[in-house]
């Protein structure tokens, strides 16, 4: 049995990240999703035995295969939590632990993943919160809980883990909390994302960032 598998759920590439549509075209957003996924998988490959990507979108699965990931076609009439359950069933009996991460956290490489995985050998449940009360990483045994990835999922996951007596351990990380949804998030990538595929792509798009004293902390523009 392997030590740990990563699970990455991806819905689609096309017409995604619509909150960025005033700033990036549909094709640009599609490419952004691909390079962010590449950053996530490049980091995880250093630390996990296999990376499992689950999606119902054939284009996503084909791209995942080009990255040498294990791919699972998501069942019909599914949702994110059902998809994760399907992926965890695949992992159960193959890996002692699983690490669930989203595909849009390109700064994951700045987090000490090795430390978290080492800690997971003696801890039952590790969780990393995202901005706005969500969840951007869980490390646990496959199917240790049924995930609750909707709304304020961080508190829900902690409550469920406590009810299961898993003694959840919280790891706060600015870089892991940064899932990309807004232009200001792109600015953070430009500041902190040195040597990432995502920052390189944003530079190709001539994305610029500077400090700002208005309603947003950063002013993000294209030249």
Model-derived features: where do they sit?
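N-terminal nucleotide-binding beta1-loop-alpha1 segment
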Residues: 1-20
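Short glycine-enriched, charge-decorated loop/helix-capping segments at active-site entrances
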Residues: 20-28
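Short phosphate-binding loop-to-helix
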Residues: 65-99
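Conserved donor-nucleotide/metal-binding helix-loop-beta segment in metal-dependent transferases, i.e.
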Residues: 108-133
């Amino acid at each position: 049995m392997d030590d740990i598998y990563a699970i990455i759920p991806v819905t689609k590439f096309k017409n995604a990240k619509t909150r960025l549509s005033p700033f990036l075209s549909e094709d640009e957003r599609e490419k952004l999703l691909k390079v962010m996924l590449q950053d996530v998988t490049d980091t995880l490959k250093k630390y996990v035995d296999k990376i499992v990507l689950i999606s119902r979108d054939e284009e996503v699965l084909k791209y995942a295969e080009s990255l040498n990931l294990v791919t699972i076609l998501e069942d019909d009439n599914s949702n994110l939590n059902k998809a994760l359950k399907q992926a965890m069933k695949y992992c159960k009996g193959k890996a002692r632990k699983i690490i669930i991460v989203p595909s849009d956290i390109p700064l994951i490489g700045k987090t000490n993943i090795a430390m978290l995985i080492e800690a997971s050998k003696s801890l039952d449940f590790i969780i990393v919160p995202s901005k706005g009360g969500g969840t951007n990483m869980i490390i646990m045994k496959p199917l240790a809980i049924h995930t609750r990835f909707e709304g304020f999922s961080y508190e829900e996951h902690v409550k469920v883990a406590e009810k299961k007596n898993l003694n959840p351990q919280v790891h706060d990380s600015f870089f892991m909390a940064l899932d990309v949804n807004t232009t200001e998030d792109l600015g953070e990538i430009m500041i902190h994302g040195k040597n990432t595929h995502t920052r390189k792509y944003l530079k190709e798009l001539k994305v610029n960032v500077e400090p700002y004293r208005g309603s947003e902390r950063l002013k993000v523009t294209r030249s």
